[in-house]
Amino acid sequence: IPIVGEIPARKDSEGDDAIVVSDSRNDRISEAFRMLRVDLNFIAKEARVLMFTSTLSGEGKSFVSRNLAVALAISGKKVILLDTDLRKHTQSKLAGVNRKEGLSTYLSGLNSNPDTLITVGAFHPQVDTIFAGIIPPNPAELLMNERFDQLIDELKKRYDYIILDNVPALVVADAAIVSRVTDLTIYVIRDGVLDRRYLPELERLHQDGKFKNMCIVLNDSQVEKKKYGYGYGQGYGYGYGHVNGYYSEKE
């Protein structure tokens, strides 16, 4: 699986809601997103619908997806970010937005006008957003609805890039369902904490071709630790417990 980007560790003061890319910022992390923008264009030049997923929660895919969206936007591209995680609404939480109308209401037929779903400048003035909406009882079934395909087709007419911030691939089926509309899958791995027991599963996803043009972005890269032999694949920080928010108590 190709590794197309490496995002350095953030400052302690910068949370998952941080936007670290701007025209005036030239530090290592901002430059890493610019390089990611270039490298993604190199490996899949025609890709316009980019899906972000991960192994489990806590990898930083929402942070990476929103900052890549900004990196693309400041290069002159029209970009929209969709929160396709109908279970946890991560992008909504990060932006401090509590909209009842969103992707879930559109897919369920409660809303038929895409224009009313789009929020302008929620976390950056040059990036539009469609938030998840109310939490539905049947997220996977909603995402299988052909209305989702129709929405993506409509957005393709308006935007150069459509960024989908999705659920972790090994937690629920939603990511595999959404992948049918994507051109490129960006699999985010947080450096130093991936449990090695997941590596065969990751390779299986790649070999089975469930995710189109699957590639890896290494997030929170610990440069100093790597000098001493640590880093990617070394830790066991997750165990099998990072599924909070994706299953109900009954499940």
Where are the language model's segments positioned?
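P-loop NTP-binding module
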Residues: 8-11, 18-19, 23-251
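Membrane-cytosol interface motif
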Residues: 1-9
